[in-house]
Amino acid sequence: MSDTTKVLVLYYSMYGHIDTLAKEIAAGVAEVDGVEVALKRVPEHMSAELLSTIHARTDFDTPIASVDELADYDGILIGTPTRFGNMAGQMRNFLDQTGGLWAKGKLVGKAGGAFTSTATGGGAETTLLSVYTNFLHHGMVVVGVPYGTPEMFDTSEARAGGPYGAATLAGGDGSRQPSDKERTIARFQGRHFAGVAKKLKG
């Protein structure tokens, strides 16, 4: 067994907000000695024509994950935009394929965390909780974000992110990008999560 703790940052992004947070979180994970991070996406199921119609990004170059490889990691951080207070269908579809891993207990005892993006804030926490219920059914250990960075207390500007997980406000038209404070919280989440995953692995 390797002494290295392996963490997967797995995400779905339509307009780039989650992609930005995922990279910040991965950078935070990488700051912890003895922890290796992988950054991957779940497959897209919408047609190229429809994605073009809604002006979604299609230029992401992050590798696509397979369901079976989840068992190879000691911790999994999942990022998904909010869809009516729930995770995006693309992430839902991917997680619905983990029944085989569940049947064999392959994810029991591993660390799990999540992060999200919403238009104006509605549904952020329920989206994160919709991810966490999957972790609990798999016997994983849910890891949130403690109030361990000043940005978690900052109310000087509109921002997202809290103890449930890092988040960003995209604005009604998606034009707002993650702020410096939101990105700092995301990086802190990655760093904190990596430390917990490392301890759980022992």
Swiss-Prot record:
Its EC number is 1.6.5.2. One of its GO terms (cellular component) is membrane. The keyword rRNA processing does not apply. GO terms for molecular function: flavin adenine dinucleotide binding; FMN binding; NAD binding; NADH:ubiquinone reductase (non-electrogenic) activity; NADP binding; NADPH dehydrogenase (quinone) activity. Its cofactor is FMN. The keyword NAD applies. NAD(+) binds at residue 15. It catalyses: a quinone + NADH + H(+) = a quinol + NAD(+); a quinone + NADPH + H(+) = a quinol + NADP(+). It is an enzyme of class 1 (oxidoreductase). Signal peptide: none annotated. Substrate binds at residue 102. Binds 1 FMN per monomer. Residues 7-193 form the Flavodoxin-like domain. NCBIfam families: flav_wrbA, PRK03767.1. Belongs to the WrbA family. This is NAD(P)H dehydrogenase (quinone).
